[in-house]
């Protein structure tokens, strides 16, 4: 078989498979004639007009507030007000600053300037070593290529 025959056979199989699927879908959906659609549209429009004539007037206009469905009691209002007062009341400045200062002093002891310089020098020296190692590796690669 040549390529064209294989592709034709594959396309026929695909069409056969999809036709089965379309047949299954068409079984559930009723067939509607185009002329019937126009008749249904006219009938639907007439029914909508009749429904509009016999509808009750709207119970609420836009100017009136909507009736509330939840009932808030005086106890709820007092509870919410007390909660708001607790969160809104500022703390004393002395109470606020004392624990923070103490925690900073305890956790981070200050280093002397010599120690800070040593740390900086160590970082600097390790960075230099890394740079030198990189340069050596680049030189070795270039020598290998040539």
UniProtKB/Swiss-Prot annotation:
Top-level lineage group: Viruses
Protein name (Swiss-Prot/TrEMBL): Uncharacterized protein ORF79
Positions with biased composition (Acidic residues): 86-96
Organism listed in the record: Ostreid herpesvirus 1 (isolate France)
Region (Disordered): 86-124
């Amino acid at each position: 078989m040549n390529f064209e025959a294989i592709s034709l056979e594959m396309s026929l199989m695909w069409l056969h498979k999809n036709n089965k699927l379309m047949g299954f879908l068409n079984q559930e959906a009723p067939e509607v004639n185009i002329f019937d659609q126009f008749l249904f549209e006219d009938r639907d429009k007439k029914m909508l007009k009749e429904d509009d004539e016999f509808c009750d007037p709207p119970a609420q206009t836009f100017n009136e507030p909507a009736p509330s469905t939840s009932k808030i009691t005086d106890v709820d209002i007092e509870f919410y007000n007390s909660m708001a007062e607790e969160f809104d009341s500022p703390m004393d400045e002395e109470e606020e600053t004392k624990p923070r200062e103490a925690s900073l002093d305890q956790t981070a002891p200050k280093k002397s300037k010599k120690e800070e310089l040593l740390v900086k020098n160590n970082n600097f020296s390790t960075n230099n070593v890394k740079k030198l190692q990189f340069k050596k590796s680049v030189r070795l690669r270039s020598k290998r290529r040539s």
